[in-house]
């Protein structure tokens, strides 16, 4: 079997609760055991993965770590080098939206435009326009 370089995308991956973190950990470990090179590309909160699996962190604002407006505002204001996507993420959250999938998809698409040396990309529920662009290339 040909050994592949595989990217697994996960917009939010709490390592101990819920299904996403468990799924990403299990599939990345299984693919690594099969001999493939695996990178997990994730937004916060980040995974605890097997040592042989590379974790690439795509930091977002992680505004859902708190539900306090003051703390969310502080997170946003303390972010250095704000981009348009950060303003969108903050304002959408402010009005009750859940923009993490969309903003992660945008960041992942930008990352994979530069780092396009993967044989396969597996997305774990990001469901965003960025994923449509990634799908065209992989």
Per-range role (PLM):
Residues 17, 49, 66, 131-132:
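Generic domain-boundary/flexible-linker signal
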Residues 42-107:
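A conserved catalytic-core segment of Leloir-type glycosyltransferases
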Residues 18, 80-83, 125, 136:
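Intrinsic-disorder/low-complexity, polar/charged segments
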Residues 94-109, 120-138:
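An aromatic- and histidine-rich active-site surface loop
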Residues 1-61, 113-116:
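N-terminal subdomain of nucleotide-sugar transferases
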């Amino acid at each position: 079997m040909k050994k592949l370089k595989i990217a697994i995308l996960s917009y939010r991956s709490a390592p101990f609760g819920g299904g996403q973190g468990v799924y990403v950990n299990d599939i990345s470990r299984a693919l690594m055991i099969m001999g493939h090179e695996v990178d997990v590309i994730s937004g916060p909160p980040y995974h605890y993965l097997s040592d042989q699996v590379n974790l690439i962190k795509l930091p977002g604002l992680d505004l859902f770590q708190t539900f306090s407006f003051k703390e969310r505002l502080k997170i946003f204001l303390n972010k250095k080098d704000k981009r348009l996507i950060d303003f969108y993420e903050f304002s959408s959250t402010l009005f009750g939206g859940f923009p993490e999938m969309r903003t992660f998809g945008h960041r992942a698409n930008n990352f994979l435009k530069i780092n396009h040396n993967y044989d396969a990309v597996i997305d774990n529920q990001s469901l965003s326009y960025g994923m449509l662009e990634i799908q065209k290339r992989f």
